[in-house]
Amino acid sequence: MHYFGVLAALSVFNIIACLTRGKPLENWKKLPVMEESDAFFHDPGEVEHDTHFDFKSFLENMKTDLLRSLNLSRVPSQVKTKEEPPQFMIDLYNRYTADKSSIPASNIVRSFSTEDVVSLISPEEHSFQKHILLFNISIPRYEEVTRAELRIFISCHKEVGSPSRLEGNMVIYDVLDGDHWENKESTKSLLVSHSIQDCGWEMFEVSSAVKRWVKADKMKTKNKLEVVIESKDLSGFPCGKLDITVTHDTKNLPLLIVFSNDRSNGTKETKVELREMIVHEQESVLNKLGKNDSSSEEEQREEKAIARPRQHSSRSKRSIGANHCRRTSLHVNFKEIGWDSWIIAPKDYEAFECKGGCFFPLTDNVTPTKHAIVQTLVHLQNPKKASKACCVPTKLDAISILYKDDAGVPTLIYNYEGMKVAECGCR
């Protein structure tokens, strides 16, 4: 992507981040740009000589905004981001993006791997396997856990002469107390008991355990699940040893998938702040109207000339139409801006942007507000009293995004709002 293509992409991220939080674009005032913004549309060689733009500082501001909107305090460490995300999370992301009718019950999905595993197996009890899985679960307070699933890969080591059919039973407990792994007297709560008849991935709902962990005191509660597998004998012959995969040299490790929703009132706050911003802008225009500033006769003639009907050639009409406010393409590639280490998917996407001017008379296709119409009329009469209405995003769409959080936990947000321009208008 060209240098200024990256700059345009980052500009969109800054606007999007501020719109989704309902905040003014304060960072723009902090950027060390010494010339008018129009300079960026000149020849690239001229820009380098005529402006003093700190691209590194600009990129850092943009990254800070995006991290904050994803509830990240910093970019995850390289050690954690280098770990391959579970295939389940990638498949889940691909399913949601490919099939728009596939809507999850919750907007946020996290995948937690085991922090530690202790296997308690007695050599005498060939058909009986027991594992204690320790997880480190961290869910923000403003999120509500709606569902939790334990995904386990069942393996079967068949013996010679054993029947082809498999049969066994798996029981999962929530370990309520007990700091020692070998504490057989620890209190347990039965979560699920399920018959096993095949190898491969199995899913078990453990919502009650995870909800308890989230609400409990982390200093007193251990996020532990006890998994017990028992193989059954069929016609006097053991089917083999049923077990779960827990060794770290495989991709089939146990996964705890936690579904949650953001229950904060961020949307309500955004609407209130946006309304306050609109009122502030209206007051600003009215204050300017109350002053006795007057523009030059030449400026007034130029603005009024736009409103007068005149005969245009077909080429001129096409040129004017192309300059009106509209949505245009803007392709964003996360690798080119150095964010691909923690954003897993998408690698790139079409963000779109708004380009063009808001000329009098404002037509319905740019959905002008009453304020924009009044502002345009005031500018037409006296450009010094009010600026033109701006071509800006009036509707933003969401995308699905898969990234790693501060702790390196793969996190999928199904509807990450405000990442793609849907409509443009004059405001």
From Swiss-Prot:
Residues 307-321 have a biased composition (Basic residues). Expressed selectively in the dorsal neural tube. Lower levels seen in kidney and myotomal cells. Glycans are attached at residues 71, 136, 265, 292. It is found in: Secreted. Its main location: secreted. GO terms for molecular function: cytokine activity; growth factor activity. InterPro entries: Cystine-knot_cytokine, TGF-b_C, TGF-b_propeptide, TGF-beta-rel, TGFb_CS. It comes from the Eukaryota. One of its GO terms (cellular component) is extracellular space. Residues 21-318 form a propeptide. Appears to regulate cell differentiation within the neural tube. May regulate the differentiation of cell types along the dorsoventral axis of the neural tube, acting in conjunction with distinct ventralizing signals from the notochord and floor plate. Controls the cell differentiation in the neural tube in several ways: (1) promotes the differentiation of cell types that derive from the dorsal neural tube. (2) ensures that the dorsal neural tube is refractory to ventralizing species from the notochord. (3) can diffuse and influence the fate of cells in more ventral regions of the neural tube. Homodimer; disulfide-linked. This is Dorsalin-1. It comes from Gallus gallus. The lineage of its organism: Eukaryota, Metazoa, Chordata, Craniata, Vertebrata.
